[in-house]
Amino acid sequence: MYGIKAGTNGEYKEPSKCAAAIWEFEDYTSSTKGVKRLANKVVPGEKRCLYHANGMDIYNHELYVTCAEPNGKGEYSVVKLTMGSTSEEWPYNRYTWENRTNAISHYKGNQFILLTETGAEGEEDKKIYKLCIVHFSAGKVVVDQTKYFMNTGYEVLQGINYSDKYGLFIVTTKKLEYFPNGDVQTSGSRVLHIDMSRTKTMKFKDGKKYPVLIPDFAFNNELDESKFFSFEMESVAIDRNTNNMIVSVNANSPIAGDNGKHPGEDYIYRFSSIEFKLSLI
């Protein structure tokens, strides 16, 4: 399994402070077995830098990473890294586009799904957002099809995962709450499930009717204050060998550290038994 960790700390306008690390996990159920940082030489300040990287997926031995550019101009891109050894630079291609996205998942053939943070124009009150089915060509993200979906989860859109067998999963979390001592907290996450073949026709404010994907199930994970001060799910995947859902989590200890702040760590959680509940629309 591969994971990515953004290291911008909000310093988008200072490339020297922006970087992302890619990690390889031989066995994600072990915190020590075969865990290594890949020596891709993607360093701060270089044109090839991943900067504030969020979503990532793997297809045909290539990693596809969604990135925000640290220039304050609202530029975003997908970087394709052709995986090699851990001691060499990997060939890469950057594909730019105008929409902010934190999530990517392989769809079919050379197509991918990008989850945008852009609501359908005029339909923001209904929490309807865009899923773009895209391919990559000549340094650009090319949109082949736009699908709309209703967000029946929380306010913040996080990671996605799609497969023909399991359908589409979307991670949502409650908004972050900031504290004077620098602590950041979110108290709940909800994973939505969408059957891409099922839609509901809805009339938008432009007078036209559009097919809208409606989540059919949701998996809630509320904050357990006895275990964590904050618990933020960021990405989701399905283990193809066990059919277990696995999620990456940024969590903070419930016990404050020496500086009065709650130390944060990254976790991988595996849910071996999940009870899906029907979302109320």
Language-model features and meaning:
Residues N60-H61, G109-Q111, K165-G167, N241-N243:
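Short coil/turn segments that connect the beta-strands within blades of beta-propeller domains
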Residues T152-F217:
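Loop/turn-rich, solvent-exposed surfaces of beta-rich toroidal or solenoidal domains
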Residues M1-S16, H52-G55:
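Beta-strand-rich domains and repeat architectures in extracellular enzymes and scaffolds
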Residues G3-G7, N60, T66-E69, L114-T118, ...:
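Recurrent small/Gly-Pro-centered beta-turn motifs in extracellular repeat architectures
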Residues K47-G55, R94-Y107, T152-N161, F228-A237:
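Repeated scaffold domains used in trafficking and secretory/extracellular systems
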Residues N9-E26, N71-K80, A120-V134, E177-T199, ...:
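Structural motif
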Residues Y28-C49, W90-W97, G139-Y154, T201-F229:
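Surface-exposed loop and turn segments in beta-propeller and other repeat-based domains
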Residues C18-H61, C67:
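Blade-loop segments of beta-propeller domains
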